[in-house]
Amino acid sequence: MKELALNHLPELAPRTVESLNLLRLRLEQTAPDAKIILLTSTTPQEGKTTLALQFWQLLAGLGQRCLLVDGDLRHSGICRQCGLTGEHKVPGLAHYLSGSVPLEEVLYHTEIRGTCLVPASGTTSRPALLLEH
């Protein structure tokens, strides 16, 4: 598995950590055996990317192994916030779904202990076509 440096993630503010811990506790109470969390909405700019990255950081900081999959194949905010654009662009979920690279090529270890990331990388105006196969 490849290594990926995420130099653009800010440290979590104490108030943010408190809110995320409350969310974590509520999720654990509601679904104690859950292993997958999906964040989604129907409109942009609602905070999905920010919440996903911050929750990922929090869980990793608590010693939990975490995989963050960026499924936004139209406008990847995670790639943008992690600095994976321009010359730092890497193969990601869109490449895997199109069959151009194997899964191992899009799964990255990060410097955050216990975390892996599958960036969306590469955008498409018709993501449903990639998801059909």
Q: What residues fall within each predicted segment?
A:
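Hydrophobic positions on the alpha1 helix immediately C-terminal to the Walker A/P-loop
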Residues: T50-L51
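Short amphipathic alpha-helix
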Residues: Q54-F55
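Walker A (P-loop) ATP-phosphate-binding motif of ABC ATPase nucleotide-binding domains
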Residues: I36
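P-loop/Walker-type NTP enzyme "switch/lid" segment
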Residues: K2-L25, Q29-P32, T40-E46, G61, ...
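Rossmann-fold NAD(P)-dependent oxidoreductase module
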Residues: L58
